[in-house]
Regions:
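Short, flexible loop segments at the rims of nucleotide/cofactor-binding pockets, characterized by
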Residues: 78-82, 146-152
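Alpha-helical substrate-recognition element adjacent to the catalytic core
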Residues: 2-132, 136
Length: 152
């Protein structure tokens, strides 16, 4: 008998990498200061994960450095779709059959998590993650601070 819910993280669990680090690689790969910026993003990721700074502070600082838009998110979705953990690929049918029980909880963002987990039958309402705030041009101007996932 299965439990009522199966809780799964996204970064380094559902996918093999950290999504914001991958976003930074996409964004800064050809930038003149790319290596330095990537290193700073990865340091902030690690500092937040290790508790050296709050998750909220880590997230805010990374977002300020990234300066991303909707196009960057679309490119990230394509890249992350190729980074699904082998065990998740192998058990895709299980996820599709048990979609109501599967909860994805992440410090990442719904905008790139939902399109990926949707391919496994996991429903949007079962994804608990941060959400971006956009301006009228489609540029990401921040994160929804009312979302509980943006906190520690």
């Amino acid at each position: 008998m299965l439990p009522d819910h199966i809780i799964v993280d996204f970064d380094s669990t559902f996918i093999t990498s950290e999504s914001l680090d991958e976003l930074a690689i996409n964004k800064f790969g050809n930038h003149p200061n790319g290596k330095k910026l990537l290193s700073k993003i990865q340091s902030l990721t690690n500092a937040g994960m290790n508790g050296d700074i709050s998750f909220e502070e880590s997230l805010e600082k990374r977002m300020r450095l990234l300066k991303i838009n909707q196009n960057d998110i679309e490119l990230l979705i394509k890249k992350l779709s190729q980074s699904i953990t082998p065990s998740f690929k192998k058990n895709k049918l299980f996820f599709a059959e048990n979609y109501e029980r599967i909860l994805v909880i992440s410090g990442g963002f719904k905008e790139f998590i939902v399109p990926i987990v949707d391919k496994f039958g996991i429903i949007k309402s079962n994804v608990f993650a941060n959400e971006f705030l956009y301006n009228l041009s489609g540029d990401i101007i921040g994160i929804d601070q009312k979302n509980v996932m943006s906190k520690n």
